[in-house]
């Protein structure tokens, strides 16, 4: 790690859906930026394995509730709603694109979205799985026929699917390739945006260095994917360890170094409002909820 005193230290929660934080660490990209980075891997695993915690009490909420200065990531809906509820701000200077898939147990007979009428789908509330599931199901089912179950984090959801606690659950990377390998039925899949969700007290130069390191990591991953596939082992949730062929896991979440569009932000807020998921938001304007690292 680079030295440089407290002014160059930043705490980061690695995002389990991507490899970028580990690549940046291993390749020394942050050290080159003069950053001293503390990766909070235990928080990442708690996020993945929590069992249906309530909003504001989830592992990803705690650093913000406890005034710990941290850089995290979440789906676009979650990042915006969290910021609106007073938990950090989102960074509009870049975004991620991640995968989701709704899987069902093989014996359930559930093979497509239309089969999920009145079937509880396991999600983590106010997180990517929650919003993507609603968005996918509302395209084919009446609202009154859509059911969700707050099972918890993505690792916990795969464990619940294995145990038969739910017939269907929405999974993310790296659980998607594991579920594929284990023979669960993919009823639907798609992609969604993620945003960086950060403590507003973090100095802009630290976030700028963090993102520059991630840009280099994104370029390295796209250029030499095979080199970095073994790093997926670090994102496997406790309880899911296994002798996996990480070469089949794919790239995971990728980053787009373009501004998050304000019209998409408005659609994100409107979606949350339509489903009544904005109840804790005290603010809903782009400028109030975002913090840019770029000079105007």
Where are the regions that the model predicts?
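Pocket-lining segment of extracytoplasmic ligand-binding domains
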Residues: 148-149, 153-235
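Conserved C-terminal helix/tail region of periplasmic/extracytoplasmic solute-binding proteins
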Residues: 273-296
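A ligand-binding cleft/hinge motif common to bilobed small-molecule-binding domains
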Residues: 72-85, 134, 162-184, 270-271
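Secondary-structure end/capping motifs
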Residues: 204-279
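Residues within well-ordered alpha-helices
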Residues: 20, 26, 78, 156-157, ...
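Short Asp/Glu-rich motifs
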Residues: 48-51, 180, 198, 291
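Short, glycine-/small- and polar/acidic-enriched structural segments
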Residues: 2-141, 148, 187-189
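Positions that flank functional sites
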Residues: 45, 78-79, 176, 194, ...
